[in-house]
């Protein structure tokens, strides 16, 4: 179809149909033509042996879906004008759309539309310029009358755009360049963009089909789209279909289990003809004496068998083999298409990659490529996964890599490929897996024998170098990327490579939801010998893994337990592993038993164990390993119900001399008075524990009383105690105050979020005056006291010589309360070093008193005034003090202090002239672009002493600001700018506990 011919034809028809007054029929002729075209196309397809597949994907569920996609929304009472039909390659989108057109033509569907127009992305991409009327009139019969009259009533029209993902358009046209006139000849890309954006024919309806990978490119063009996903065969339907294809029920059950153990292959089976292909490969391998489980172990193994079967090595009647140059050209076309998400090879693509018609015929005969049945100058790989396989092979067949300083094309950059993940770059994921799988020596040997060539393995060393670089890039070490990476590394089935690949990773984050993931992680992680920290979320217990009859094969349960044993064996085989976090895991009796055995192993070197928010099934909590494991010093059970058995085994372990726990975190563990008393009894004989966090438990005054008995014990080793939000009141402060004077070791106490009031603060203040009080840090955040409490604390500070950290945040001290405190803080013998006054209802009036403290207290090095409305005037007062050479404050918190661009000069003064302030928090202030720009001009100087500056994440990510921050990072690399301070346990220094 040539553009020039179409234009001539259109001009001729235009002269014949100038009258808009002509009466024409209800579109029966057009409906007939449309039906004939679709049936002709289906007939051509059936000649290629694919007619069964076309019918297979049309299920009653899909037909029901078609009937309701334009129904009114129940809440808005509006019918969607734009619907997107989304699904994987080969799932049946095109078939479903053509079925919809046929149903309309037969009068069974969408009768609210007088005309339905079907537009295919493959065809549209080959057209350069036309009017929209020309574009849709290819099959318009003359008996219908002028198409212009039809287009004049857009609210009764439905436009179906098939294969949006194949449209080779950028869709970056500015709004003013779009076209409203459907008679105007324009670039076809402009026409389609205008239609999608509702500039042309805005009242019309759209039904757009696309692969999932193109959704992000499509959605910005649409107005209020409704998305409908085609899911293909369900899990049960897949299993039934595999049974049907393999006939032999016993063998089919084994195949299903093997396929389900490889979630990639099992997922591929949701597309009918992929399921057929996979089962055909399994049949072929079994007939040759192969084992189903070995063929299914990796997706690369199965596809290598399949690709090699397309080029049989027989002397008579064999398919002509492509030479290495031809194979490389095909692979390059494949990889370029995968990266750009373009899966149709047009004439220009063939010329670009130097593929002749004879070359194409070779791959057509081998069933690697197929010719489009409608558009004869379009070629595609027989399936997306076949294209992905050849795309991966490209990286093994590249030549002259040493002559390139930089990759000439983005798709040649292996580092970019490894950086990708299945959420943001789903189109690259399977190709990446195939690439790693092709490092396997058996796969390479198969391909070398099939294609009679030698494959270089230089890419192996390239990948290892990229993995090393990936580990050094902190932004790449997300759970998402690492899990993707493990799936890829597993494909190699090469223990030596896996060991080399994982030697760069000291910290990993993985999640196990299903048995296939467990198999992969258990295989890979035991080869990660440099691993120091492992965060594992185990959500799949044994019962859930064996949830179907097909899975319950003989020995399956034993195999699953073996995988868990393999995974947790790293606790004793990896001597560098010192921390394990089982955050949000579900642990049953079997897993708890395995864990206990591994943690009790004499070679276990683990020091820190975290069971945060863990769900122990059927009360299987068991911490008996603590009695014999002398290495574990840190146990965190936050947000985990200890249960009866958990508390019992924990208390028994704490009583044992072999238990060496130093840190125990039991925040939000559903502890009450009775449980607290049992814990306190166990602690009476414990000599190792130095940190205990019991926050967010309803201990009340009685529970705290039993803890005070522990503190009064001269043999107690407790140094830090956190009792935030434990129901403590002023009545409990009396017994606590008494214990504080008798405790010889306690240095840190957190009582935040308890209603102590002024009376409770008075009792604690009396204790602070006592010479025997050893407290160094006291956290009284949100304890409901007033300036009266401040006065008590102020008096205590005049006598106390040990306290260096005081947190009074979220109490209504007001300016008067702070004034009382400042009187004591300015005294030369006051040893306080860190003062937290967040959300204390302070104003600029308090800044004068605070400024005096900054000048007169040489010990104070950290002051947090966040969430107080100090305004620019308050900062101005503080800045005068900060410029004083006697001021030694290093850390200054000014988050949400009502600062505006008017304070910019004062901030610049702090950054330029103050030599002590090295950390500052400016988040949640109304600093504009110009203010941050000016700050960056000072921060970029290598002489700037600032080490950390906290700014809002949304500000940091703004394009206008980003370039200034990059400049700062280049010129002043020791400075960190971000919303969180690095290298601190809590993540932010202003959050102490």
Swiss-Prot record:
One of its GO terms (cellular component) is cytoplasm. Detected in adult ovary and testis. Detected in oocytes and in germ cell elements in seminiferous tubules in adult testis (at protein level). Residues 81-403 form the NACHT domain. GO terms for biological process: cell differentiation; spermatogenesis. The keyword Phosphoprotein does not apply. The keyword Nuclease does not apply. Keywords: ATP-binding, Cytoplasm, Developmental protein, Differentiation, Leucine-rich repeat, Nucleotide-binding, Repeat, Spermatogenesis. GO terms for molecular function: ATP binding. ATP binds at residues 87-94. It is found in: Cytoplasm. It comes from the Eukaryota. LRR repeats lie at residues 636-657, 660-680, 688-708, 717-738, 745-765, 774-795, 802-822, 831-852, 859-879. May be involved in inflammation and spermatogenesis. PANTHER family: NACHT, LRR AND PYD DOMAINS-CONTAINING PROTEIN 12 (PTHR45690), NACHT, LRR AND PYD DOMAINS-CONTAINING PROTEIN 14 (PTHR45690:SF15). Belongs to the NLRP family. This is NACHT, LRR and PYD domains-containing protein 14. The gene is Nlrp14.
């Amino acid at each position: 179809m040539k553009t020039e011919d179409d234009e001539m034809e259109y001009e001729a028809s235009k002269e014949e149909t100038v009258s808009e007054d002509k009466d024409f029929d209800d579109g029966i002729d057009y409906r007939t033509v449309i039906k004939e075209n679709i049936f002709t196309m289906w007939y051509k397809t059936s000649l290629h042996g694919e007619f069964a597949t076309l019918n297979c994907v049309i299920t009653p569920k899909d037909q029901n879906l078609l009937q309701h996609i334009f129904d009114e929304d129940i809440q808005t009472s509006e019918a969607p004008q734009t619907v997107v039909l989304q699904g994987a390659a080969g799932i049946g989108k095109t078939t479903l759309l053509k079925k919809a057109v046929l149903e309309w033509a037969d009068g069974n569907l969408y009768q609210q539309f007088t005309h339905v127009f079907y537009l295919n992305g493959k065809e549209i991409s080959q057209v350069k310029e036309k009017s929209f009327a020309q574009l849709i009139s290819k099959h318009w019969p003359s008996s219908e009358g002028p198409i212009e009259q039809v287009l004049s009533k857009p609210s009764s029209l439905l436009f179906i755009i098939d294969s949006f993902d194949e449209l080779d358009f950028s869709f970056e046209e500015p709004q003013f360049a779009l076209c409203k006139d459907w008679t105007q000849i324009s670039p076809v890309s402009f026409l389609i963009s205008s239609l999608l954006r509702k500039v042309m024919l805005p009242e019309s309806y759209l039904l757009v089909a696309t692969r999932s990978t193109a959704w992000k490119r499509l959605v910005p063009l649409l107005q209020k789209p409704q998305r409908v996903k085609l899911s293909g065969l369900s899990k049960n339907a897949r299993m039934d279909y595999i049974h049907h294809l393999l006939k032999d029920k016993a063998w089919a059950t084994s195949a299903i289990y093997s396929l389900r153990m490889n979630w990639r292959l099992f997922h591929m089976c949701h597309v009918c003809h992929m399921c057929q292909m996979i089962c055909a490969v399994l049949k072929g391998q079994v007939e040759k004496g192969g084992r189903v489980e070995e063929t299914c172990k990796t997706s690369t193994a199965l596809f290598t068998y399949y690709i090699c079967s397309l080029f049989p090595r027989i002397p008579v009647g064999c398919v002509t083999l492509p030479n290495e140059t031809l194979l490389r050209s095909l692979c390059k076309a494949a990889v370029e298409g995968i990266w750009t998400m373009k899966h149709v090879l047009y004439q220009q693509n063939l010329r670009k990659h130097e593929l002749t018609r004879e070359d194409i015929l070779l791959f057509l005969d081998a069933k690697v490529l197929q010719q489009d049945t409608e558009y004869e100058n379009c070629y595609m790989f027989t399936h997306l996964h076949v294209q992905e396989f050849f795309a991966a092979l490209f990286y093994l067949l590249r030549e002259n890599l040493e002559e390139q300083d930089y990759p000439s094309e983005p798709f040649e950059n292996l580092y970019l490929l490894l950086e990708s993940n299945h959420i943001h770059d789903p189109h690259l994921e399977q190709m990446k897996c195939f690439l790693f799988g092709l490092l396997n020596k058996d796969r390479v040997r198969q391909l070398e024998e099939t294609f009679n060539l030698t494959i270089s393995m230089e890419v192996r060393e390239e990948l290892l170098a990229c993995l090393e670089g990936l580990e050094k890039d902190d932004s790449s070490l997300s759970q998402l990327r690492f899990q993707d990476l493990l799936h890829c590394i597993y494909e190699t089935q090469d223990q030596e490579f896996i060991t080399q690949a994982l030697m760069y990773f000291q910290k990993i984050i993985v999640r196990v939801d299903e048995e296939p993931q467990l198999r992969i992680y258990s295989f890979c992680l035991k080869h990660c010998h440099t691993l120091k920290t492992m965060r594992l979320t185990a959500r799949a217990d044994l019962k859930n893994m064996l949830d179907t009859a097909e899975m319950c094969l003989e020995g399956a349960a034993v195999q699953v337990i073996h995988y868990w044993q393999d995974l947790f064996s790293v606790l004793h085989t990896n001597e560098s592993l010192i921390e394990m976090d089982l955050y949000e895991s579900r642990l049953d009796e079997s897993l708890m038993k395995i864990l206990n055995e591994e943690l009790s192993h004499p070679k276990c070197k683990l020091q820190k164990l975290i069971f945060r928010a863990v769900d122990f099934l059927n009360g299987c909590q068991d911490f008996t390993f603590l009695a014999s494991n002398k290495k574990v010093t840190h146990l965190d059970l936050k947000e985990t119900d200890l249960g009866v058995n958990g508390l019992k085994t924990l208390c028994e372990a704490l009583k044992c001399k072999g238990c060496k726990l130093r840190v125990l975190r039991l925040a939000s563990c559903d502890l009450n008075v009775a449980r607290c008393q049992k814990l306190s009894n166990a602690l009476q004989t414990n000599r190792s524990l130095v940190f205990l966090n019991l926050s967010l438990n309803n201990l009340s005054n009685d529970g705290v009383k039993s803890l005070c008995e522990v503190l009064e014990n001269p043999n107690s080793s407790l140094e830090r105690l956190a009792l935030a939000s434990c129901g403590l009141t002023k009545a409990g402060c009396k017994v606590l105050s008494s214990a504080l004077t008798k405790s010889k070791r306690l240095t840190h106490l957190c009582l935040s979020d308890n209603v102590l009031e002024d009376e409770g603060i008075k009792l604690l203040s009396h204790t602070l005056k006592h010479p025997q009080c050893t407290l160094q840090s006291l956290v009284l955040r949100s304890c409901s006291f007033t300036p009266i409490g401040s006065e008590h604390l102020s008096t205590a500070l005049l006598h106390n010589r040990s306290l260096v950290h005081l947190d009074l945040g979220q109490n209504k001290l007001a300016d008067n309360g702070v004034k009382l405190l400042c009187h004591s803080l300015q005294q030369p013998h006051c040893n306080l070093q860190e003062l937290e006054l967040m959300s204390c209802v302070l104003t600029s009036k308090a800044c004068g008193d605070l400024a005096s403290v900054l000048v007169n207290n040489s010990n104070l090095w950290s002051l947090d005034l966040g969430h107080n409305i100090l305004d620019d005037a308050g900062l101005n007062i503080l800045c005068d003090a900060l410029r004083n050479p006697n001021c030694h404050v290093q850390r200054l918190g000014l988050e949400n202090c009502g600062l505006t661009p008017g304070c910019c000069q004062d901030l610049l003064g702090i950054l330029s002239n103050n030599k002590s302030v090295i950390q500052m928090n400016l988040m949640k202030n109304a600093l504009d672009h110009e203010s941050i720009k000016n700050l960056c001009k000072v921060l970029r100087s290598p002489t700037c002493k600032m080490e950390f500056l906290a700014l809002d994440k949304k500000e940091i990510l703004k394009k206008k600001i980003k370039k200034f921050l990059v400049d700062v990072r280049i010129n002043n690399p020791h400075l960190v700018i971000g919303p969180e301070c690095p290298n601190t346990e809590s993540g932010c220094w202003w959050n102490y506990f």
